């Protein structure tokens, strides 16, 4: 047992070293700036783009300086959701496609989305048309910068896959690193703005309220993430001394923080598309109205965000907890739930529980990170606060997931004598 513990510690240390190397490469990429971009104009463009700023931070991107990894994992995350939707359409029969080809299809979709996003961003800023010998015109410069941004996004997908194989946390580590880097900067900017605009008693009280709210939200997120519905399981092959420890745990919020990341990414995608179209059709009234109405500070944009968030909260619950697989595993191991027949009845029972819990989780997400955005329609400052609440939930969930993965690795192969010989 002692030798197994040492091996587990060595495994965790090895994976942590790989993750450290991958994060180091990620940080280098964030500091490789794309030439020919007007940084001041980019900052002005991002100034009122609250959702874009938050999305950029929660996908590992860095638009503030237009670096190699400016797009982050946003295109890949959007492609993953779109592919998941396509697999639900039975006519396409995409579930039978091999994993290798599925990955290539998702990469292709991510590249298309990446080009749309890069063009949408570049079209709002001035660029130097002579950034290289291959780009002597405005169009050539845009194409070159777009290619660099998309290449960085694809490399980031590969980097996250390497961390999934060799390190700890997969792509979540890169997103976590990005959020940790961005947070001190955003907090310091907020404090400086208040100091410059005369730091009075009201500003001090507001900052104290914000700090207390952040602490409360962190504690609430931890409690919700750790809360479980435990379904007792009878295990025929397990020693009766351990019977009371046999249960199927299902989180109260089965989807975790993933719906927040993906809902933000999906909501910003139509904005990118309209921004790109607006570049080619600058005087089109429909495009301008669309851009104005789907903003996160408008009723339509907020409502769309809440609907997407609610739907993804239920969808991700069934991705994280597969009732079909659980029912099959229980039946194969001769285990069963009290008063529930093995097989289809068990699957339906677990499906019902997951749906109920996911509905509760969806309401929780909507109330904490969705409905407060309606206050931003009155005052845009509240939009920033509401989106920050969502990013806190994401941050806490990412940290919890990484800690759980490390615990699982440390206790790997540590089994008690549960089974009869």
UniProtKB/Swiss-Prot annotation:
Q: InterPro entries recorded for this chain?
A: SecY/SEC61-alpha, SecY2, SecY_dom_sf
Q: Where in the cell is it found?
A: Cell membrane
Cited Pfam families: SecY
- Per the record, the domain of life is Bacteria
Q: Which GO terms describe its biological process?
A: intracellular protein transmembrane transport; protein targeting
Which residue spans traverse the membrane?
A: 17-37, 69-89, 102-122, 139-159, 165-185, 204-224, 254-274, 299-319, 358-378, 383-403
A GO term from the CC aspect: plasma membrane
Topology of the protein relative to the lipid bilayer: Multi-pass membrane protein
Q: Does the keyword Membrane apply?
A: yes
Q: Does the keyword Membrane apply?
A: yes
Subunit structure and binding partners? Component of the accessory SecA2/SecY2 protein translocase complex required to export cell wall proteins. May form heterotrimers with SecE and SecG subunits.
- Family membership: Belongs to the SecY/SEC61-alpha family. SecY2 subfamily.
Q: What does this protein do?
A: Part of the accessory SecA2/SecY2 system specifically required for export of possible cell wall proteins. The central subunit of a protein translocation channel.
Q: What is this protein called?
A: Accessory Sec system protein translocase subunit SecY2
| Gene source species | Leuconostoc gelidum subsp. gasicomitatum (strain DSM 15947 / CCUG 46042 / CECT 5767 / JCM 12535 / LMG 18811 / NBRC 113245 / TB1-10) (Leuconostoc gasicomitatum)
């Amino acid at each position: 047992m002692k030798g197994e513990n040492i091996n587990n510690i060595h495994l965790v240390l090895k994976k942590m070293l790989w993750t450290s190397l991958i994060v180091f490469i990620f940080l280098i990429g964030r500091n490789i700036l794309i030439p020919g971009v007007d940084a001041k104009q980019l900052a002005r463009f991002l100034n009122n783009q609250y959702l874009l700023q938050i999305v950029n931070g929660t996908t590992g991107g860095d638009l503030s300086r237009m670096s190699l990894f400016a797009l982050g994992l946003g295109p890949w995350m959007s492609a993953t959701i779109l592919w998941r939707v396509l697999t639900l359409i039975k006519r396409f029969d995409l579930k039978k496609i091999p994993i290798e080809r599925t990955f290539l299809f998702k990469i292709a979709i991510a590249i298309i989305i990446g080009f749309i996003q890069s063009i949408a961003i570049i079209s709002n800023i001035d660029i130097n048309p002579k950034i290289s010998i291959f780009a002597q015109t405005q169009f050539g410069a845009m194409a070159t910068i777009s290619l660099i941004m998309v290449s960085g996004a694809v490399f980031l997908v590969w980097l996250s896959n390497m961390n999934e194989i060799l390190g700890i946390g997969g792509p979540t580590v890169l997103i976590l690193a990005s959020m940790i880097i961005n947070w001190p900067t955003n907090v310091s900017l907020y404090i400086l703005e208040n100091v410059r605009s005369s730091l009075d008693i009201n500003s001090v009280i507001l900052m104290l309220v914000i700090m207390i709210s952040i602490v409360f939200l962190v504690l609430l997120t931890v409690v919700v993430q750790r809360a479980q519905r435990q379904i007792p399981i009878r295990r025929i092959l397990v020693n009766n001394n351990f019977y009371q420890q046999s249960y199927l745990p299902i989180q109260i919020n089965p989807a975790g923080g993933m719906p927040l990341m993906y809902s933000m990414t999906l909501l910003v995608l139509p904005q990118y598309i309209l921004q790109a179209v607006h570049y080619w059709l600058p005087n089109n009234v429909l495009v301008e109205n669309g851009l104005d109405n789907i903003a996160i500070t408008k009723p339509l944009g907020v409502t769309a965000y809440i609907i997407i968030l609610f739907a993804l909260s239920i969808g991700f619950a069934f991705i994280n907890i597969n009732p079909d697989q659980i029912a099959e595993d229980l039946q194969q191991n001769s285990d069963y739930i009290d008063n529930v027949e093995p097989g289809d009845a068990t699957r339906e029972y677990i499906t019902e529980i997951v749906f109920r819990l996911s509905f509760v989780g969806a309401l929780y997400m909507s109330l904490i990170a969705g409905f407060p955005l309606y206050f931003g329609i009155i005052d845009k400052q509240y939009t920033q606060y509401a989106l920050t609440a969502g990013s806190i939930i994401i941050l806490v969930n990412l940290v919890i997931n990484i800690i759980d993965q490390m615990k699982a690795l440390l206790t790997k192969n540590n089994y008690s004598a549960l089974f009869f010989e």
